[in-house]
Amino acid sequence: MAMSDEAMFAPPQGITIEAVNGMLAERLAQKHGKASLLRAFIPLPPPFSPVQLIELHVLKSNFYYRYHDDGSDVTATTEYQGEMVDYSRHAVLLGSSGMAELRFIRTHGSRFTSQDCTLFNWLARIITPVLQSWLNDEEQQVALRLLEKDRDHHRVLVDITNAVLSHLDLDDLIADVAREIHHFFGLASVSMVLGDHRKNEKFSLWCSDLSASHCACLPRCMPGESVLLTQTLQTRQPTLTHRADDLFLWQRDPLLLLLASNGCESALLIPLTFGNHTPGALLLAHTSSTLFSEENCQLLQHIADRIAIAVGNADAWRSMTDLQESLQQENHQLSEQLLSNLGIGDIIYQSQAMEDLLQQVDIVAKSDSTVLICGETGTGKEVIARAIHQLSPRRDKPLVKINCAAIPASLLESELFGHDKGAFTGAINTHRGRFEIADGGTLFLDEIGDLPLELQPKLLRVLQEREIERLGGSRTIPVNVRVIAATNRDLWQMVEDRQFRSDLFYRLNVFPLELPPLRDRPEDIPLLAKHFTQKMARHMNRAIDAIPTEALRQLMSWDWPGNVRELENVIERAVLLTRGNSLNLHLNVRQSRLLPTLNEDSALRSSMAQLLHPTTPENDEEERQRIVQVLRETNGIVAGPRGAATRLGMKRTTLLSRMQRLGISVREVL
């Protein structure tokens, strides 16, 4: 016969329901959680036997909730395995919620009696409604917590996605990602290890300064070869390590040593995989070993997947900007190369002073020695520098020029040595300096006498050590550059006046070249005048083929304080104002000290005689045929006692200059 509900919940003999309710009602009514529910049973009123531990096992969730008589409570996934004298196990039917099991445990004293078990069984039945209500609340709380967790996970993924989509610059990207990860997880360290083919190092470590308000991201060289990184990149699987478990690895791996020095106890390395490419890894560390739960690791893997895409995009953008800069530099270098292709044979002269100078140029060009070109303004120092470069083994590498007087002192250091991003206000990108651009080639430092004193030690260091440091950077960059300096100032006098460092002067003055002013080589003026006339006439589409004798006399009688540059400007103005085929030289230019008259200098008369006749196409063709014939007779040999220059009665450089002007190639002639 089935037991009625009244009989089922009736108290055992000797127990009044009022006594039990009076003691349990207040505790059971609280129902603030598992501990409150179990706490209602300890201590039990007489005639219940005392217990030291109560354990509730909910089969649906498979959790064990324990409450001790000392007031402590524990949630576990396995039942109590500690010392016990006896226990009493009782099933609790929860309807649609399944079953639970209540254990009353005695850890010391005597064993339970049958009456104890009867009392415990009755208690298990009367708490069924309370337990059912509590489980319903618990399920709702669990569902709510899951929804909140999903919401938080979705939020952090959205924030990370927004961060990676809003930046193409790698520095800003990593800084924003580090800030979002730190904000959500509270990690002590967020870093990235990325491969960088632009640097000598295989990998660079990007460490975020999480203590700063702007969460700055600071790239640095890898401290050494990391076994942990190699393993992660090879397997393409996350690697989690704890210092307490892997002490041997933490004492030897450079990445882990760096983290340990900052107080970190656990580290997670997640590969950044984008397609078939793994450019690096996300390095996370914390002072606790419990933060990297399985759930957090899965979320961090999703974050790493988004970061990998962003890093790929940032790298592609950086490659595009580098390519753009490279193309601009290449365009500049090609323009410079067109000018630097002018060798000694293209320098117009016939004076002995220039012949002696160019012999020195020919000697020094074959070495890597530093050259200091001195001379007045307008004497052609840059032309000589280009000739040295063109005759050197570096001719196929760039010739880079910088005018030290034309750039403000505040910008000159950046132009020479470059700067890293953030080195100063407005430095939004990394900038390569002229030394880096000229690597492998030649750097021409024009107007070196105007180099500020504060930059001279840095230039001296580059000349000595062959390495530079960008402005705002800490990494040394080796450079292989041949330096040619030029000045129109008296550097030695500047050294004595303490306006120029003596040690830098000696470094630059390895092979000095002194360019003669135009007034000291007047025999070159007719040739230069003819060259500039032809050049300007072609440029202005004028048919000017003669220079009057009187015009040449007057040109050769001036002292030319502006030297060749001034002569070129005078000829340009004359060509501009000429309306016929004979150069109309306007003499409204100030005349200063006159040079010796033509009658007193046979060299000047000889120079004049070569230019008194008009330069006609017929004369050019005759000269061309004569040079071609002699080249064929000498088998293309230009210099030497059997060369064409000797047979034609002219210097080698003069012959080469005329061959270029007339379009004669030895290869085509033979």
From Swiss-Prot:
BP GO terms, sorted: DNA-templated transcription initiation; phosphorelay signal transduction system; positive regulation of DNA-templated transcription; regulation of DNA-templated transcription initiation
DNA-binding region coordinates: 641-660
The GAF domain, residue ranges: 169-311
KO phenotype (gene knockout): No effect on expression of the hyf operon.
Residues holding ATP: 375-382, 438-447
Keywords of the record: Activator, ATP-binding, DNA-binding, Nucleotide-binding, Transcription, Transcription regulation, Two-component regulatory system
Alphabetical list of InterPro entries matching this protein: AAA+_ATPase, GAF, GAF-like_dom_sf, Homeodomain-like_sf, P-loop_NTPase, Sigma_54_int, Sigma_54_int_dom_ATP-bd_1, Sigma_54_int_dom_ATP-bd_2
Protein name per the record: DNA-binding transcriptional activator HyfR
Species name: Escherichia coli (strain K12)
